[in-house]
């Protein structure tokens, strides 16, 4: 996964099955937003906007297909901790991949990337048959412990509506709403209105 500055935000080369690349921008100006929308040209090109969207911004993204709504950017202070015994961490440069296996079967996983004093958590997932056992929290604890060892002091993540409760229970705080779009909205697909955005 490669990323680089793009205008006021970032362009991430995701190279995943559903996303080839993703633009990420925090409270872009209207001209910058229009530029980003024009670059979001296909269903595998995504645009994530952090911050509130006003009526003009909603008009600017009307041609795009909403992927998510109600999500939020969250942050926490990273403190030293022990990696739980059940969490296996594999490190590739500045990225750590955590996984928990139960009787040889993948039960939960996640990853985190450190840059300077910040660590970004991503793809935190518990497999359906292993949910409600606290495994997601163990993955987060393991990744936090690893990142503290690297010198990270601030954690960041993009939380889904369903994931927010887990992160809040671990001491994370929401700091801004976010919404993700992809290119190629169908003509009959509903757009995103003010009522669809987090309050």
Question: Regions from the language model: what does each represent?
Answer:
Residues 54-65, 137, 149, 161-178, ...:
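Conserved active-site alpha-helix within GNAT-family acetyltransferase domains
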Residues 1-9, 18-20, 70, 91-98, ...:
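A short helix-loop-beta-strand connector motif used in the catalytic cores of GNAT acetyltransferases and
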Residues 47-51, 66-76, 158, 173-191, ...:
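Conserved catalytic-core motifs of GNAT/GCN5-like acyltransferases
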Residues 62-104:
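Acyltransferase donor/substrate-recognition loop-hinge adjacent to the catalytic core
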Residues 42-51, 147-159:
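Conserved GNAT acetyl-CoA-binding A-motif
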Residues 90-127:
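A conserved beta-strand-loop-helix scaffold within acyl/acetyltransferase catalytic domains
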Residues 1-58:
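N-terminal charged segments
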Residues 32-36, 126, 132-145, 149, ...:
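Conserved acetyl-CoA-binding loop-helix of GNAT-fold acetyltransferases
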């Amino acid at each position: 996964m490669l990323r680089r500055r793009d205008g006021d935000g970032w362009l991430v080369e995701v190279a995943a099955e559903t996303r080839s690349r993703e633009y990420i921008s925090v409270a872009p100006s209207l001209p910058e937003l229009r530029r980003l929308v024009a670059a979001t040209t296909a269903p595998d090109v995504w645009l994530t906007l952090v911050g509130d969207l006003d009526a003009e911004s909603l008009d600017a993204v009307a041609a795009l297909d909403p992927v998510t709504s109600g999500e939020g950017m969250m942050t926490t202070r990273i403190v030293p901790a022990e990696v739980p015994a059940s969490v296996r961490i594999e490190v590739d440069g500045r990225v750590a991949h955590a996984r928990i296996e139960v009787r040889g079967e993948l039960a939960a996983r996640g990853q985190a990337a450190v840059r300077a004093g910040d660590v970004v958590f991503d793809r935190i997932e518990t497999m359906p048959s292993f949910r409600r056992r606290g495994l997601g929290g163990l993955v987060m604890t393991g990744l936090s412990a690893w990142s503290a060892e690297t010198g990270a002091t601030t954690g960041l993540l993009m939380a889904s509506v369903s994931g927010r409760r887990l992160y809040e229970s671990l001491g994370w705080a929401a700091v801004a709403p976010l919404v993700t779009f992809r290119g190629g909205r169908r003509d009959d697909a509903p757009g995103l209105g003010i009522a669809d955005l987090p309050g």
